[in-house]
């Protein structure tokens, strides 16, 4: 009898836990994805803060020349970063227990792998939590689908690119100047500015900013006034009101006359779908571009391919970019190799005599 009561009590405790996790009445929805999201993001955030402040220098290139990234080792907020895991580790899974000591783990950049892998798992769970809450509230799943774009972008730079390049040392450093360094090196080695998917990503981000500004300004300019002239028009809105808060017909008419009729949406649902889909598609293209360039399917290279009828090279802006890429690559890992890989791979001319 006692055993039966204990089983019922334990079952009820588990049942109450399940109800609490999946309840939409909580101030913050937990969800089953949240059960995994919370510890992984807490771990990533905690290690990031500690490492950014106090981590010792990391031998990123695997040549016994450690690079400092933390505040206590001479950096500031701008120059500080979590230095990627050493090239000596490559793509090996490198938890603390795989190192001979904590000092060795820190020297080889173990915190970077820990932070990145926990972060990627955490943001993926956040996306799943968005879907889970939408499902329980009877909403459509497109919030999670839109969030998939930045998740894909983060996965591309922190996981897919290192896999393609053969080492976590090629991943993006976790810091401001480290991000810029990653961008410059990426341009030098892959010519990303000449990649169509990057161009589409730029169109998505800047186009999304433009469309959001246009939409917000049109809505703000065509509010249905519910207040007197002495009060702010914003005070006329009540949360949850059934009435329209702005006149879409007026906004449509204004923009249609400003550009042309069919440049303006007359369907609010189509308009907001477009506002969401445009930047999301752009970020997807960028993430796809990073993932393909990870395996060295690089941007266009018109290297001396534009010639006149006599075969003479016509200098173009593409040639200027190629020269800039070589210059940036010379400066990258300057102690690891003395020449750009593009030059070092060329066979030396034969010398007779």
UniProtKB/Swiss-Prot annotation:
Residue positions of the PTM N-acetylthreonine? Answer: 2
- Where does the record place it? Plastid membrane
Q: Report the catalytic activity.
A: 2 a plastoquinone + 4 hnu + 2 H2O = 2 a plastoquinol + O2
Q: What class of enzyme is it?
A: oxidoreductase
Site feature Cleavage, where: 344-345
Give a short account of what the protein does: Photosystem II (PSII) is a light-driven water:plastoquinone oxidoreductase that uses light energy to abstract electrons from H(2)O, generating O(2) and a proton gradient subsequently used for ATP formation. It consists of a core antenna complex that captures photons, and an electron transfer chain that converts photonic excitation into a charge separation. The D1/D2 (PsbA/PsbD) reaction center heterodimer binds P680, the primary electron donor of PSII as well as several subsequent electron acceptors.
Give the protein name, as stated in the record. Photosystem II protein D1
Please spell out the taxonomic lineage of the organism that makes this protein: Eukaryota, Viridiplantae, Streptophyta, Embryophyta, Marchantiophyta
Gene expressing this chain: psbA
